[in-house]
Amino acid sequence: METTVSLVQMLDARERRVQHQQELLARYHKPLICFTMNICGPVKDSPLIRRGFARGRQLLRQQFLRAKLTPLYQDAVREVTGCEAFYVLDADPLTIKKFTTDIEDATPLGRLFDMDVIRPDGLKVDREELNLEGRRCLICGGPAKVCSSRRIHTVAELQEKTTEILTEARDAQDIADAARLAVRALLYEVTTTPKPGLVDRRNSGSHKDMDVFTFMDSAAALYPYFEACARTGRETAEQPAPETFAALRPLGCEAEGEMLDATGGVNTHKGAVFSVGIVCAALGRLDRSLWAEAARVLAEVSAMTAGLTEKDFAGVTAENAATVGQKLYIRYGITGVRGQVEAGLPTVLNIGLPVLEEGLAKGYDFDRVGGGALLAILANSTDTNIIARSSRERQLALTEELKALLVQTPYPDKDALAALDDRFIAENLSPGGSADLLALTWLLHFVTTEGNIDE
């Protein structure tokens, strides 16, 4: 519930803020940034406002990195009277003012940032010292001081515009981050080396028509698609979850075409177009605060695809089964990736992700961790690619063999993985379904560990 604040509360907060500034200046004798939000009206704190504030802090950190500056001191407070952050920097005040005004002027969201730069003597650095114009009005773009002094715009108008700016900035960041992490996951999957029978940096596995560069081309081509999936999720978030999934179908068809264009007709990521696209849409449907909960993200995947298996296999018989997936469903009841997403990707949640994160906690490198997660996934799921390239019997025997291996060595080293790779290639085996689940495992790892930007 949003809390309104009184004028007295705001004056008290301002007094405390000034006192804190004076304490920091007296302690460090260095310039100081005081960052607050320009929020009109009696509500100064909300989840949406905090998201905007977090984005502002992120942009400041990026400027510090660009300028090779490490704050001598930094802290942040969140009160009903608003968010505040303080940074003490050993740098020229005008240099600091230049990059804070760059942030303030770069985007509509920047208009809501108030990044004061205070000299060691306590005086603020003015924009005019950099020959910059004053701040612009949120609504009309005119001089903010003029509009404010004349009260040209009502509080309601300013609040509506503020909400619009904050919402658009939040959605744009969430959509871009979902797509970025999705592409990153695809790249981590293909570069994990060695991977038995799969394309990696060592070789092309059991494939003759693709290599690691083919996969990189494909992953890059899919970024706009993953953005579109996340955007669709956000735009349909208030609708029943299956409606979001239905809206993805035409996007997926278009993405397959982009993939084939990028690879010269090679199917590198058809499975990932389906499964990773669904996860991106699920992220779009969810508030960013829920990204840290893998089970919640995958529950959304399950809700979106409810009834998918029954619907897609309705009417399929032994006589008319045409695809590998249809034939395996009729003969063995294997539901493949449809069953995985409809169940909320249990192999990712219960096998891949725990193995990946435990390996990282042990300090193993990405190759060894990724290899261990891949084998655990392959040993605890039904990879239809393995069956298609051999038989159901070989797939079952392989899973038992891998389970025994993983009991002894949960994270096989490079030599052991390379030996497995050679064996898989000799048998023409390629666990492509497990590779897709490994990519999803990396994606969920990135989302849960890096998705929460609210410091």
Where are these regions (language model features)?
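Long, hydrophobic/aromatic-enriched structural stretches that serve as scaffold segments
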Residues: A228-G284
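Short, amphipathic C-terminal "tail helix"
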Residues: A426, S430-I453
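Phosphate-rich cofactor/ligand-interacting catalytic cores and adjacent structured alpha/beta frameworks
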Residues: E164-A241, F245, L283-D422, T449, ...
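Short, well-structured hydrophobic secondary-structure segments
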Residues: L32-D92, M210-A237
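Short, structured motif recognition centered on aromatic/hydrophobic residues
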Residues: S275, G371-L378, L437-L444
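Short, conserved charged micro-motifs
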Residues: D45-S46, P93-T100, W291-R296
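Long, contiguous binding/interaction regions
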Residues: M1-A67, R78, K98, D102-D171
